[in-house]
Amino acid sequence: MQERLKELQNKIGYRFRDEELLISALMHSSYTNEKHIPKHKCNERLEFLGDAVLELISSEFLFFANRKTPEGELTRMRASMVCEPSLAFCAREIGLGEYLLLGKGEETTGGRKRDSVTSDALEALIGAIYLDGGFANAKEFIKNFVLNDLENKKLFYDSKTILQEMVQGVHGNQVLYKLVKEEGPDHNKSFTVEAYIGDALYGEGTGRTKKAAEQEAAYHAILKYKGNKE
């Protein structure tokens, strides 16, 4: 366990003074339930805190980076940047899923790659860094792993808009999103959506909401569509 923690800290470029905070950030509720650990020890409280820290820092970034942009557009941009699919994308770049502490059920059903799980863990990690190292270190982490390479990330977090513009510009076709699977209890649903251009299937996505699943399906559709044109 210690080697894994060290490896993750090397990846993110931050060394925890209190590694218990890092462990808590990686601990999913399925793990605490299975191991009979008190519920408050899982990463949900840190996720709550990290969400607030992320919103403040991303708001500050957008405020100064877009000095003439009106409030409504800034709000839309922030919502896109910190939505579940976007944060899951950032978590995948770090490989965060492989370090999570999951219960056996969550593990066997693909929890390490589930957007809802990895995006929540990323926010929990932000909360843990904030508590351990303060605002400046949390800001540095967000700058390096969430606000970095925004041009390429825009392809992901605004995929539906980009795909529609690409398709209309060439074929005048509409993109159709089809819900093909809905599973799980009401408090933890998972949706699977397919993206079609004309009659052809171009992408599939899974998310905790239909919108998140559509965004991921659109992202994969863009990659396939661009590949077909090359």
Predicted regions and their residues:
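Double-stranded RNA-binding/processing signature
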Residues: 1-230
